[in-house]
Each structure stands twice: as structure tokens, then as C-alpha cells.
């Protein structure tokens, strides 16, 4: 029983990553991409730890980053992603084809 109580305490202490921090991380990534790969058009992030770093949640999906925007396409647990994250653009998708179709 004590383990469950400790788990609840730790869970209650977790706070979402602030939106300003998420935006700063994206801007740093874009600056690095501009320096290393001038003219880059899009980067796809699907590794869960990297997704957490950029979005504040690790739901199944893909984060697509372009110089002008970034969209986190969530395949499973969209509601959880929205509840956990302060990322500015989270969209649901049923398959990765939906995200691909958005970009033409």
C-alpha cells in the first residue's frame, strides 16, 4: 500500500512542460537545422523521448516540423496528448496517410 501512495504523490507532482519552453526548444532546433542543412523543408520526429522533449507528451504519432510551423499528429490517445501537453498544434489522425495528405 505504501508503494501506491508514493506513486500517487510522485504523479501529482508532475507538471506539464510550459508552452514557452516547448516553443524555445523548437526554435533552437530550427536554428540548428538552418545552420546544418540550409534549405531544409521538413523534419519528422517519431522517437518517444524526442517527442516528449518537443511536445511534452509521448503519445503515438509523429511530430512534423517545418521552418514555418510544427504539427503533432497523434494516432492514439489524442485526448491524453491534449491534456498532458501545452504544444500549440495537436491534431488527431487515424493513419499516417492523413498527415501525409495534409502536406500534399
Briefly describe each language-model feature range.
Residues 1-72:
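Terminal domain-start leader segments
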Residues 63, 102-104:
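Short, charge-rich binding segments
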Residues 74-102:
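Compact, glycine/acidic-enriched structural inserts
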Amino acid at each position: 500500500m505504501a508503494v501506491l501512495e508514493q506513486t500517487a504523490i510522485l504523479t501529482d507532482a508532475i507538471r506539464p512542460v510550459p508552452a514557452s519552453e516547448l516553443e524555445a526548444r523548437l526554435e533552437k532546433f530550427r536554428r540548428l537545422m538552418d545552420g546544418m542543412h540550409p534549405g531544409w523543408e521538413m523534419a519528422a520526429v517519431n522517437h518517444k523521448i524526442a517527442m516528449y522533449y518537443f511536445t511534452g507528451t509521448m503519445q503515438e504519432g509523429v511530430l512534423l516540423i517545418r521552418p514555418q510551423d510544427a504539427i503533432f499528429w497523434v494516432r492514439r490517445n489524442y485526448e491524453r496528448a491534449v491534456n498532458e501537453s501545452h504544444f500549440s498544434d495537436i491534431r488527431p489522425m487515424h493513419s499516417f496517410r492523413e498527415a501525409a495528405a495534409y502536406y500534399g
